[in-house]
Every structure is written in structure tokens, then in C-alpha cells.
Amino acid sequence: MNVFMYVIREFEDALDDCQKGIISDNYNSVHAWDEGVCFYTGSIEGQDGVTSDGKLIHQLMDKRCADFKTCGSEGDSVDGRAKLNYDIGGLFTLGNFQIKSGDCSAARDTLEKITAKMYIPLLQGTMSYAYELEMLQGGEKEGAEGATFVAAVLPRIHAADPVAASTVYDSMKVGATATDYKAVKSAIESVYPSLGITCEEVGGFWNSGTNTYYEGMEPCTKSESTSTSSSTVRSATFGVLFVLFAMMVLSM
């Protein structure tokens, strides 16, 4: 998850340079923005962005879209690139143009949208492992991977709603005695508007064997992203990050 944060750091660096007026030479800020794109994508994806060997966030998006039926340009398939990668790719290009144009405020709004979407595969991972732990006899491996996803998203959920974060933590923490996947899913979905994401973007946990959603893991139907709330959540997230992560470590 350190790469995830470094991607954001590079974009923030680009915006800092933009605000300082370094955009006058069109190099520093644009270069930092491009570095953010590189750390998001990696070198293995190639020109078409379709591979099973990727290692960074781009590949995580593609992997989770197959689990949640959000692949393809329309976001309704289990094959190909994640729709989120199409969407974020467009935002990368837009942000680059805005910085080159010196429109720092608009670039900030674009980064807010990118950051919100980057959290989606982490939320998908949290919900899928909650289901596997309760309904598919998941063991230590699933518990550890689920706890890892939770460690990455819990501060952001907490910034939106501490009660929702507590619900997720109680079910997914290392050493949890029981997991309630429906409670986890409901708690996460309740903060979608504050996180700036939608039900359609997240999808539902797909059972490829039956070509249906796992029971209780269907996509939700009502959520409207709010960019203002997303900005507030982003600011608050970093303030609680280390406290909540320490709680996860101490419970091990």
C-alpha cells in the first residue's frame, strides 16, 4: 500500500509546483504528475494496459473488476481492463492538461476524483474477503489479506463515519472471532457519498461459477458521490491514519 500513497504524493507534488508558479517552465509540475501516473501503472502493463503480470494499482483494478463485474469500457463485464482504469486514464490526461495550462484549482478537483476512485479496489477487496471469511470457510490467508485491505481503507472510512469504521474493524481485524459480511458491506456502502464514489463504480461480488452475484453481495442501488465531502474526508484521513493502523498492529 506504500505505492498507493506515493502515487498521491507525486500528484500532490505536481499541484504544489503548480501553485508556486513553477508551471512557468512547464516541467517540474508536469514531470511530477507523470511520475504519479508511472507509479500507478508500472512498466509491465505495456501499451494496451492488459496483462495478468502487472504489480501495481492498475493491475489491482483489473483483478478486482473481474471479481465485481466492473470490467470493460461500460463496466459490465468480467473480462478486460477495469472501467476504473479507463476513467482514471482520462483523468490523468485531463490533470496533465490542467497543470500545463496553469489551472491549478481544476487540477486539484481532478486529483480528488482520481484519489476517490483509487480506493475502490481496496473497498472491493475488503468486502470480498469479508464474504469469503464468513461464507466460504476462509482461513488464515483470507483473514490476513482482508485485514491488509482494511488497514488501507479504515482511516478513510473513519473520517467519513467512525461508527461505520468500527463495524468494519470489528469484523475484519486480525484475531476477529467472527465476521459479519452483510454488516461490513452495509457499513462501507453507507459512506460511498462521502468518499466520492458510487454503487455502479464498485459493483457486487460476482460468482463466475453460477454467473450471478453471491447472495447478499449484489451491487447497491443508491449512492451519489459528493466531491466536497470527498475533499473533507481526504484531509481528515491522514490525521487518523497512524492511530488506526497502530490499533491494527497492537491487536495482532
Please provide the spans of the model-predicted regions.
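Mature extracytoplasmic or organellar-lumen-exposed domains after removal of signal/transit peptides
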Residues: 1-224
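Exposed boundary/loop context
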Residues: 29, 139, 232, 251-252
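C-terminal GPI-anchoring signal of eukaryotic secretory precursors
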Residues: 222-241
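A cross-kingdom C-terminal cell-surface attachment/processing module
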Residues: 239-251
